[in-house]
Amino acid sequence: SMVPITPLRVVPIQRYRQLCPTAEDIEVFNLLLLRKNAEEILKGDKSVEFRVYSPMHCERLYDKNVLNFLKRHEDNKEVQQALEKGFIEPLRMVNSIHFHNYTNSWYLDVECKANDTMALIPRDVKFIQDNFNCHELDEALADLETRKEKNRPCYFWFALGDILGTNLE
């Protein structure tokens, strides 16, 4: 005899999409950069920019309205489920980056194709390698793996696209 299949309770995602604020995109994200790194980007040798996961960058890259919503609903299982499944995202998407030095004597505007967070662990580094052909973190990862280091640094990463403008030669 057939066993009746009970449908799983579906989280009313649409309801939370309406209730929950959406993280606002950042049209132009200002970042300080060493000139030699800017030149690597221009030559096409640097495809991803990394920034340490710090309070300063969290303040700029996480949407306060979404964070406040999540704080107000931290005991709501459906909201937490929607967050885990990626239907609610507090990280703001960056559309372009305005790189410059301290004195603003030069600038480099670059399209940002994607941005997210990562830890210095094999899975995350492999993602960056496979998707953006970036090997900047390979040595640091190998070192931590060799030392069997438990605590791993976290970063924000920005996948760089087309050059939008510059005054660098």
Predicted regions and their residues:
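Structured alpha/beta reader/binder surfaces that contact nucleic acids or chromatin modification marks
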Residues: 5-23, 27-169
